[in-house]
């Protein structure tokens, strides 16, 4: 069953580019002159929808993305080059062998770059 998570944005095109490049996904649909843009690998799973809104983000997100990566340094450099911010520069969090870095996209929405513990696969539950 398809599912959407909607992320508000004052200026969706830069975030569309950011998340497409970070997740190696593509624009699946865009309508109402770009007010809504859905991103994903296909239309079957979870898709991110960027929704244009007039107001800027205020406060911490109540939910965030964990982008699962094979290693942390390359994706961190890529995210920074695409306009992300490392929220705790130089800090890597760790719990039970899992590691993550807290980041923010170009509009300040929090996400984590997440490295699975050795021997775990992408289906394992996340500890944070």
Model-derived segments and their meaning:
Residues 2-10, 28-31, 38-40, 55-128:
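Vicinal oxygen chelate
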Residues 12-36:
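N-terminal first-folded block
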Residues 15, 19, 79, 108:
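Conserved active-site tyrosine of GNAT-family acetyltransferases
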Residues 33-46:
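C-terminal "cap" of GNAT-fold acetyltransferases
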Residues 44-48, 109-111:
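Short, charged/polar, Gly/Pro-enriched secondary-structure boundary elements
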